[in-house]
């Protein structure tokens, strides 16, 4: 049964209904610009401790809405909690970002077990806590990274502009790379469904490094098709839950992404010609 918040201006707008005003929310609306966030972050000891503490992450999720009249809360978490759930060591280094134990060979992919969804239970607890405290006219957004983006981090071992290790891996071991994509696809689908069951009223899928696949002419195979499979699985169970797709830096292939996935709402990057994209999408929402 869908848990749709019909009073939310955000949900009404994302579903193409008339609303009183344009809803506002920010992808990173909780964070270091808030002194109250910095205080909690300091007490938590580490970024990951904060992400995996339901009470603290719920408080951080709600902080921006106490300061600003935003229309939605987006859960405070990180896309790399998924590699953590399959025992890939992860740490965040100051001024460098995430570092995790990289996948070095094909064998590691076939031995990889993505079954520890209970490891992510603190995220679902956080969603439930936020939902219980959120005003009814505010929506709650859950999210996850898309398979290609997560795979890129798991092979590279850290963030990168061009992800050379990942590119080399899928160029030389495409069958094994697709095995990793498929495993992640299944896990991410289940993770997002669990978020909906915990209270999320909309879901965002972050394909943050779509540009890497695009450069290698693999955007459809590595990004669009896995995203589409995740969307279809969620929609079979929760057809009314809106899903937002963000294939960052997809350039002229944003339209193809929307056409194939039938996504409810599209997030775009700063390089997009909005007027041109709207003309290409016709009646689709942005």
Predicted region positions:
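N-terminal basic, low-complexity leaders that serve as flexible interaction/assembly modules and, when applicable
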Residues: 1-91, 228-229
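Short, glycine- and charge-enriched coil/turn segments that flank and shape catalytic ligand pockets
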Residues: 2-3, 42-44, 106-115, 175
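Short low-complexity stretches enriched in small and charged residues
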Residues: 24-33, 96-99, 160-161, 218-219, ...
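The substrate-binding groove and active-site-proximal loops of carbohydrate-active enzymes
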Residues: 48-49, 110-121, 178
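Glycine-rich, proline-tolerant flexible connector loops at the mouths of alpha/beta enzymes
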Residues: 74-94, 99-104, 110-116, 199-220
